[in-house]
From Swiss-Prot:
Lineage: Eukaryota, Fungi, Dikarya, Ascomycota, Taphrinomycotina
Protein species of origin: Schizosaccharomyces pombe (strain 972 / ATCC 24843) (Fission yeast)
Mod. after translation: Methylation of glutamine in the GGQ triplet is conserved from bacteria to mammals.
Chaperone keyword on record: no
Designated name of the protein: Putative peptide chain release factor 1, mitochondrial
Annotated positions of the N5-methylglutamine modification: 270
Length: 396
């Protein structure tokens, strides 16, 4: 049986080709997968072996130092994952060498078949290796709570903010997630908002959407513009892990929250003036306040307000625990100033650009539908984020 030149070429490039192939499929660069991931894993594996050798001689050192014990446990997981990857790599390398030196066609084919079987295990091995280096936080699996508000740009900003809300609702529907408003303040007579808070409930919703937090900028010619000038407006998007009221006991003591009730100030006739249905919560230690008047029921407004407060406090606690990384990346919104843009939506050029990774797509209308193209765009950003974390991660 004769092998094609294409098949022989494929396997003569060994594990380096495997890594490049997987990198392309996942959106990584070869540089980041082969060098950063593998070298970091190799270094940590070597560190584990050194610890292991020392602690075999002095078991009391690890027993008496809980921080050291935790670090060694983390290093052990990296070492085990790296050892599996290294074993697969070496098997492929040995088989490649045998295939190159063997003259018998049948033996060559047997080597190629075995290489193919082992190669199919490489993607899972790389994924396991990544997960030991970058274990996902528990919050990644939580539902997401999203807050969107217009920034610079007046009415045009309020219209754009509403378009973002619709885009995320459509994306939730595309993913099969449940999406519902907690609070929405609409601009009368326009498809525009001054604020929207909504939850997206689905497995991993927060992990999928957390990198959407930031200032989104729109550039287009408004319908009311008589001279054809392009206007620039912004909207802020805040993405929080949604923590249910049942899980809030670990976040604060009930005595730390001041609860105020008042009459609703929105439009709605005499009911607004007679019933104290609006609720304002203040978390005294942090000064975080949440006001809710979306429902005519005080009980419902209080429940919604606590849901928002829980999510904000959970995000605040997470930010404190990861202050160094948060300051490096500055992913979350601090204001809606134009200079802090995370992404630009240029309608005149039919282009959307994410400024963190320099990624552009010239099909803005399809992107705003929140379906497959939007999902692919977000996946590339998540991959970029993992690359950055790999570059800067430390095992502690």
């Amino acid at each position: 049986m004769l092998l094609t030149k294409k098949v022989l070429w494929y396997f003569r490039h060994g594990i380096e080709y495997q890594i490049r192939s997987i990198a392309c499929k996942k959106g990584y660069s070869e540089h980041n997968v082969s060098r950063v991931l593998i070298e970091k894993a190799r270094s940590l594996s070597s560190e584990y072996l050194q610890f292991h050798q020392v602690n075999n001689k002095d078991q009391s050192a690890m027993t008496n130092d809980t921080d050291l014990a935790k670090r060694i446990a983390r290093l052990r997981r990296v070492h085990n994952a790296y050892s599996k990857f290294k074993s697969l790599s070496e098997q492929i390398s040995d088989l490649k060498q045998m295939e190159a030196q063997e003259s018998d066609a049948e033996v060559k084919m047997m080597a190629v078949t075995e290489i193919n079987e082992i190669s199919n295990k490489i993607p899972k091995s790389i994924e396991d290796l990544e997960n030991t280096l970058l274990p996902q936080a528990d919050s990644y699996a939580l539902p997401a709570l999203i807050e969107i508000r217009p920034g610079v740009g007046g009415t045009e900003a309020a219209i754009f903010a509403n378009e973002l809300v619709e885009m995320y609702f459509q994306y939730a529907n595309f993913k099969g997630w449940n999406c519902k408003f907690i609070s929405k303040s609409a601009v009368q007579g326009l498809e525009a908002i001054t604020e929207a808070i909504f939850s997206i409930e689905g497995e991993g919703a927060y992990g999928h959407l957390m990198l959407e937090g930031g200032v989104h900028r729109v550039q287009r010619t408004p319908a009311t513009e008589t001279k054809g000038r392009v206007h620039t407006s912004t909207a802020s998007v805040i993405v929080l892990p949604q923590v249910s009221n049942d899980e809030s006991s670990s976040l604060y003591d009930s005595s730390e929250v001041k609860i105020e009730v008042m009459r609703s100030r929105g439009a709605g006739g005499q009911h607004v003036n007679r019933t104290e249905s609006a609720v304002r919560l203040t978390h005294i230690p942090t000064g975080i306040t949440v006001s809710m008047q979306d429902s005519r029921s005080q009980h419902q407004n209080k429940e919604k307000a606590f849901l928002v407060l829980n999510s904000r406090l959970a995000a605040l606690n997470a930010a404190k625990e990861n202050e160094a990384e948060r300051l490096k990346r500055k992913n979350q919104v601090t204001s809606s100033d134009r200079s802090e843009k995370l992404r630009t939506y240029n309608f005149n050029q039919n282009r959307v650009t994410d400024h963190r990774i320099g990624l552009s797509m010239h099909d803005l209308s399809t992107f705003m539908q929140g379906e497959e193209k939007f999902d692919e765009f977000l996946e590339k950003i998540r991959i970029w984020n993992r690359e950055q974390l790999l570059l800067h991660s430390e095992i502690v």
